[in-house]
Curated annotation (Swiss-Prot):
GO cellular component: chloroplast thylakoid membrane; photosystem I
Transit peptide start-stop: 1-26
Protein name (database record): Photosystem I reaction center subunit psaK, chloroplastic
Phylogenetic placement of the source organism: Eukaryota, Viridiplantae, Chlorophyta, core chlorophytes, Chlorophyceae
Source organism superkingdom: Eukaryota
Subcellular localization(s) per the UniProt record: Plastid, Chloroplast thylakoid membrane
Length: 113
């Protein structure tokens, strides 16, 4: 029984690994073709909605896909003369990002990017 008591334990605490600092840089992204595509697609969808070329909270579509003015069903108040709200900004920003991702992945798929 004495041998069991003096045997070193099988579980030894391990030292924590040293952490090294990691530097993340965006040098290759700012101004790259991917960045320009994302900026252009988001800007295009926001501009289309702001200037009445796409549906917004204030401009809904009919069954024939015509834009018609309607009352603000979202209940969001806007000081913008065209009635552009934060709901429109978020929706069109998401649509622009989706469009941009599709363009980038399509161009990468055919090897053009």
């Amino acid at each position: 029984m004495q041998a069991l008591a003096t045997r070193p334990s099988a579980i030894r605490p391990t030292k924590a690994a040293r952490r090294s600092s990691v530097v993340v840089r965006a040098d290759g992204f700012i101004g790259s073709s991917t960045n320009l595509i994302m900026v252009a697609s988001t800007t295009a969808t926001l501009a289309a909605a702001r200037f009445g070329l796409a549906p917004t909270v204030k401009k809904n579509t009919t069954a024939g896909l015509k834009l018609v003015d309607s009352k603000n069903s979202a209940g969001v108040i806007s000081n913008d003369p065209a009635g552009f709200t934060i709901v429109d900004v978020l929706a069109m920003g998401a649509a622009g990002h989706g469009l941009g991702v599709g363009i980038v992945l399509g161009l990468k798929g055919i090897g053009a990017l």
